[in-house]
A protein has these predicted regions:
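Short, small/polar-rich loop/turn modules that mediate ligand/substrate recognition or access, typified
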Residues: 90, 174, 179, 235-237
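Substrate-binding pocket helix/loop in short-chain dehydrogenase/reductase
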Residues: 100-101, 105-113, 193, 205
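Alpha-helical segment proximal to the catalytic Tyr-Lys
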Residues: 129, 171-175, 233
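Conserved glycine-rich cofactor-binding loop
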Residues: 13, 20-21
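Residue(s) in the substrate-gating loop at a strand-loop-helix junction
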Residues: 142
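C-terminal substrate-recognition "lid" of short-chain dehydrogenase/reductases
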Residues: 130, 214-242, 247-248
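Active-site helix of classical SDR
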Residues: 124, 158, 166
Length: 249
């Protein structure tokens, strides 16, 4: 043995959308630590630049909105020009704001479905021509589509479609050996959570979690690494829930 430690994604090329904060940023850092070159996206240039600086190496930032097909074309043109192929795609860009049924507007509906459903679909579609056979596609779901949290109907519905995507695409891509799975987190302590929920609401959420606490972004990142790597070589077409047991009881 030569003592060289090989990372789980050594030499791989990964694309992670919406990776300027939270779980996806933690995942990008972990993927790089495990040997990948990672392309990350974000809508705001200042946040994207900060994320690239934080990751520090083997990372390319591409500004863009995953709901904008022109931006997606520019993303994958950059990947093709710089690396030529993709091994891992984590379609993590998403959006959601709470609205009770009587508060839902067309704009609210279109924003959620435009990014979470439409954006995810076209992200995967436009990535596939660059995919190496045997690669891994991960989509970020939400346990809101299973738990029925009041006020989250549009968000829950826009995330539930990804389970259908995963099942069908796993079948469609079987001849290329490309796996497609959904990573579904529950409540995770991120800046977005701080923005959306007050302390009382967060304590209420924590009371529903058998693990007794919100997850950390780094904990979800390790699940993404599992799905991205050969550790999950026989895992395909599923929804892997990492929510501390919330949906299990």
């Amino acid at each position: 043995m030569n003592g060289v430690i090989v990372g789980k994604l050594d030499g791989k090329v990964a694309v992670i959308t919406g990776a300027t904060s939270g779980m996806a940023l933690a995942g990008a850092k972990l993927f790089v630590d495990e040997g990948a070159h990672v392309f990350i996206t974000g809508r705001r240039k200042d946040e994207l630049d900060q994320a690239v600086e934080l990751i520090g190496r083997n990372v390319t930032g591409v500004q863009g909105d995953s709901a904008d097909l022109d931006d997606l074309d520019r993303l994958f043109d950059t990947v093709k020009r710089e690396k030529g192929a993709i091994d891992v795609l984590w379609a993590s860009a998403g959006t959601g704001e709470p609205r009770r049924h009587h508060e839902i507007t067309e704009e609210h509906f279109d924003a959620a479905f435009g990014l979470n459903a439409r954006g995810t679909l076209f992200t995967v579609q436009k990535a596939l021509p660059l995919f190496n056979d045997g690669g891994s596609i991960i989509m970020t779901g939400s346990n809101a589509s299973q738990r029925g949290y009041p006020g989250w109907s549009v968000y829950a519905a826009s995330k539930a479609v990804q389970q259908g995507y995963a099942r069908v695409w796993a079948a469609e891509l079987k001849d290329r050996g490309i796996r497609v799975n959904v990573l579904t987190p529950g409540q995770v302590a991120t800046a977005k959570q701080e923005e959306l929920f007050d302390e009382a609401t967060k304590r209420q959420f924590e009371s529903l979690i058998p693990r007794g606490k919100m997850g950390r972004a780094e904990e979800i990142a390790t699940v993404a690494l599992f799905l991205a790597s050969d550790d999950s070589s026989y895992v395909n077409g599923i929804e892997l829930v990492a929510d501390g047991g919330t949906t299990a009881i």
